[in-house]
């Protein structure tokens, strides 16, 4: 029973990290590619049109005077919540679009390995292209051992059509994040 609970906990933890890193990657893509920020103009125009439609709709409803304030507050709440949901969805979609190809390539490389812990594939955390040198730097969150990464370096290069400059290393910004 404990093994199932541990497996379920690890799977939920992995999914939480994947969702969080999708948001982080989406925000990073908005910063790296300013042209994507046109999406916010489209969202603002769409919300303006939606607000006008809601006002017309509210005028056509005949609500009892006792419920009028509750109805108005509910409509204001909806007008606040819907843009927040759209913003989060757009950011997650951008993160997903940036990560899907790289993660799929790594799943092909590591998908048949029996010693991949809990069958959890690497999650793309950061992806940035250096404009001066043209080098794309990728950072993954993974539970796969360093030995397996080093054994699979050639397969990774072939499947992703890349050349790895330097060594594959552990660590995040402070070099203390062991799974990045």
Where are the regions that the model predicts?
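Accessory regions of macromolecular translocation/handling assemblies
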Residues: 1-180
């Amino acid at each position: 029973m404990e093994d199932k609970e541990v497996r379920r906990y690890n799977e939920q933890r992995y999914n939480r990290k994947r969702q969080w890193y999708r948001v982080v990657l989406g925000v990073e893509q908005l910063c790296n590619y300013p042209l994507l920020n046109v999406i916010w103009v489209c969202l603002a125009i769409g919300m303006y049109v939606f607000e006008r439609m809601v006002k017309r709709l509210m005028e056509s409803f005949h609500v009892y005077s006792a419920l009028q304030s509750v109805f108005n507050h509910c409509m204001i709440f909806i007008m606040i919540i819907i843009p927040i949901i759209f913003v989060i969805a757009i950011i997650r979609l951008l993160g997903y679009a940036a990560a899907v190809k790289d993660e799929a390539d790594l799943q092909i490389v590591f998908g048949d390995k029996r010693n991949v812990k809990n069958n959890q594939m690497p999650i793309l955390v950061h992806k940035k292209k250096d404009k001066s040198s043209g080098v794309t730097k990728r950072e993954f969150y993974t539970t796969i051992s360093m030995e397996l990464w080093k054994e699979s370096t050639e397969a990774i290069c072939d499947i992703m059509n890349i050349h790895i400059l330097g060594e594959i290393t552990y660590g995040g910004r402070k070099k203390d994040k062991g799974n990045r």
